């Protein structure tokens, strides 16, 4: 769906993430000491990231496993739901949420998108955005004890994924 058309009918930009300064101030101190320096390098790189070279799209921006209905016996995705986070945002950001399920799934989605669209995505950018998103969520919920264990685990998963991609 063309972003200009979607804006004309009321689509809004996706909700911004926490700033790099907020990630440093609120998320990094919560990380185990062994991860802080690597996380700081990622936040620094994220802060310098230029605008998405492929522009903005109207997208789902919430394509993780909790918003997908799978038929595990058939190995098939039957549907997606919860479009509350849909909006206009950077194209590469649309590809980070599947990493909550599995990094291999993200790679398969990216490869399929490239095949169908003829566009090349930057895997490094996707990995960096994945880690930054997890740190942003940790920063956002740092003062909510009931969410902290899950957000910390997510941030550590994102950092490990970034490291596996050669980033951290």
Task: Describe each model-derived feature in a short phrase.
Residues 62, 82, 94:
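Acidic active-site catalytic centers that drive phospho-/nucleotidyl reactions
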Residues 58, 79-82:
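Pre-DFG segment of protein kinase catalytic domains
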Residues 22, 52-55, 85-88, 96-168:
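Helix-rich C-terminal or lid/interface subdomains of diverse kinases
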Residues 66-68:
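Hydrophobic residue at the +6 position relative to the catalytic HRD Asp in the kinase catalytic loop
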Residues 16, 79, 99-101:
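Alpha-helix boundary/interfacial micro-motifs
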Residues 70-78:
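Active-site beta-strand-loop-beta-strand hairpin of nuclease catalytic cores
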Residues 91:
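Acidic donor-binding loop at a coil-to-helix junction in glycosyltransferase catalytic cores
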Residues 1-62, 72-73, 114, 155-163:
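An alpha-helical support segment within catalytic cores of ATP-dependent transferases
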């Amino acid at each position: 769906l063309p972003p200009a058309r979607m804006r004309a009918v009321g689509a809004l930009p996706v909700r911004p993430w926490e700033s790099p300064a907020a990630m440093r101030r609120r998320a990094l101190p919560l990380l185990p000491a062994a991860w802080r320096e690597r996380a700081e390098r990622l936040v620094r790189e994220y802060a310098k990231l230029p605008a998405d070279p492929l522009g903005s799209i109207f997208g789902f921006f919430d394509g993780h496993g909790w918003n997908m209905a799978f038929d595990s016996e058939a190995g098939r995705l039957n549907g997606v739901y919860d479009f509350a986070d849909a909006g206009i945002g950077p194209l590469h950001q649309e590809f980070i949420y599947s990493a909550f399920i599995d990094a291999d799934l993200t790679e398969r989605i990216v490869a399929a998108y490239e095949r169908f669209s003829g566009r090349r995505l930057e895997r490094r950018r996707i990995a960096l955005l994945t880690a930054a998103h997890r740190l942003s969520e940790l920063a956002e919920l740092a003062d909510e004890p009931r969410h902290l264990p899950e957000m910390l685990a997510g941030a550590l998963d994102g950092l490990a994924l970034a490291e596996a991609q050669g980033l951290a």
